[in-house]
């Protein structure tokens, strides 16, 4: 399945999608998204980290919402009950971040771009 309308409820997924050249798929972001700087003028904000506006998210008609861990479990549960697909990441270290990038590449069909981004990070570590 290919996802075309994505809401990102974490800053790192927003930034990663931009770095992967997949920002055209983003239809909504967390209010904490600041990188790249243009995200603040390009994408609507749908709430804070632990208090997203479910009605606003549903109105954007996403086919995927990206969340983080148990900290956003209540938000994820509400979205799932509304029939929206949710993927929750649980990255808490560098290895987890690299797995997140790899997973996003697989979910969005941009595995080569994800691999290149990971290789760039690994070269700097």
Which sequence ranges carry the predicted segments?
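N-terminal ligand-binding lobe of clamshell/alpha-beta domains
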Residues: 1-125
């Amino acid at each position: 399945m290919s996802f075309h309308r994505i809401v990102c409820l974490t800053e790192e997924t927003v930034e990663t999608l931009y770095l992967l050249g997949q920002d055209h798929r983003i239809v909504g972001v967390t209010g904490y998204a600041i990188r790249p700087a243009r995200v603040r003028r390009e994408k609507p904000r749908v709430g804070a980290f632990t208090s997203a506006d479910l009605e606003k998210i549903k109105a954007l008609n996403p086919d995927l919402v990206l969340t983080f861990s148990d900290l956003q479990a209540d938000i994820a549960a509400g979205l799932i009950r509304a029939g929206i697909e949710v993927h929750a990441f649980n990255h808490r270290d560098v290895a987890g971040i690299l797995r997140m990038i790899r997973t996003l590449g697989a979910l969005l069909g941009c595995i080569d771009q994800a691999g290149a981004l990971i290789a760039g990070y690994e070269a700097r570590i």
